[in-house]
Design a protein with these regions (language model features):
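Secretory targeting and sorting signals
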Residues: 1-36
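A short helix->beta-strand "capping" segment at the edge of beta-propeller domains
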Residues: 36-57
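Beta-rich, blade/repeat-based domains predominating
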Residues: 52-70, 96-119, 127, 147-164, ...
Length: 332
């Protein structure tokens, strides 16, 4: 695709600003094998990624509820979709509600989705925090405002105590919404913050820095004024464009990357690649429950609208069940 066409297509997307710059630099060409090293395999080599769903839009974020249903935000149409099981056709849950940011599922099953992840709101979000966090009913698609007064929302994370954290990619702001509704758009600051997650015990917030000096930060919840740079990407990954973030069952961060096509995992003080070859990835998440997008399975979403299961990232799945699940997904 010509650069002019790429810029025109992606001009409205804050995350795509980095993509366009990467294209101009030529980094969307194949990345050398000297990118993040492969993670050590625990056993036999895993099966390759399998496509399990397709959406008609740039998928910005995905999350799975306890019933094994996946929910996705679609950047260009601003819609929220529900996919009931691998191989199922997506159900359009909402119209264009501006749902172009992250999505999380609350314990009661309702969704929280971010808005304002366009270029204008992202670049001005630190100065003019006017974006909303919306609450969406997973059955009816009914929409209400959960919180407002946040910077343009890219990433969304939910803490065990119900606190919500957000990122604004075009600035530095990390927002916080407490369970009693208090909003602080400047709770903490990290350069070019993108993917976000909360440690299992709720004591730290993990944030991905996407550009300039990609890496991973830890923000102590008790001391948000002092974020700590935890891991820096290697020199060969300076243009990898890390994006969405999730945690595995051991609390280790996994990160989707745009340009390198790798899914990284944080191990100790370094990053390794769980999987490669999935270019323009935006988010990764684990399934839940015993059916559908089930527990222990890792899923990836991307700019291409495709959802893949990534067996290399699976955990806690008996070998027979894993093989059966993959066969079912291929059939779908």
């Amino acid at each position: 695709m010509r650069l002019r066409s790429l810029l025109h297509t992606f001009s409205g997307n804050a995350a795509a600003l980095a993509l366009a710059a990467a294209a101009a630099a030529g980094v969307l060409a194949p990345v050398p094998a000297a990118a993040a090293p492969a993670c050590a395999a625990a056993g036999a080599p895993a099966a390759p990624p399998v496509q399990v769903a397709q959406l008609p839009d740039w998928v910005e974020s995905i999350a799975v509820d306890r019933r094994g249903r996946m929910f996705a935000t679609a950047y260009f149409t601003g819609r929220v979709y529900r996919i009931d099981a691998p191989g199922s056709a997506p159900v359009t849950l909402t119209g264009n509600i501006g749902a172009n940011g992250g999505v999380v599922v609350r314990p009661d099953g309702r969704l929280l989705v971010g808005t304002g992840n366009d270029l204008a709101h992202s670049l001005t979000g630190d100065l003019f925090p006017v974006s909303k966090l919306l609450e969406v009913d997973p059955e009816s698609g009914e929409v209400s405002t959960y919180a407002s007064g946040l910077g343009g929302i890219d990433g969304v994370a939910l803490a065990p105590d119900g606190t919500v954290y957000t990122t604004t990619l075009g600035g530095r702001g990390i927002g916080r919404v407490t369970p009693d509704g208090r909003v602080d758009p400047h709770w903490a600051a990290v350069p070019q913050p993108n993917g976000i997650a909360v440690s299992p015990d709720g004591s730290e917030v993990y944030v991905v820095q996407t550009t300039v000096a990609p890496g991973l930060y830890r923000i102590p919840v008790g001391d948000p004024a002092h974020p700590r740079r935890w891991i820096s990407a290697g020199a060969s990954d300076v243009l990898a464009l890390p994006d969405g973030l999730t945690l595995d069952g051991r609390g280790r961060p996994l990160i989707a990357t745009h340009a390198s096509g790798q899914i990284w995992r944080a191990e100790g003080g370094s990053l390794c690649a769980v999987e490669s070859g999935l270019r323009l990835s935006t988010q990764v998440t684990y399934g839940q429950g015993e059916r559908g997008f089930s527990a222990g399975r890792l899923y990836r979403a991307g700019v291409d609208g495709r959802i893949h299961e990534v067996p290399a990232g699976a955990e806690g799945i008996p070998e027979a069940a894993g093989a059966a699940g993959t066969a079912e997904n291929k059939a779908g």
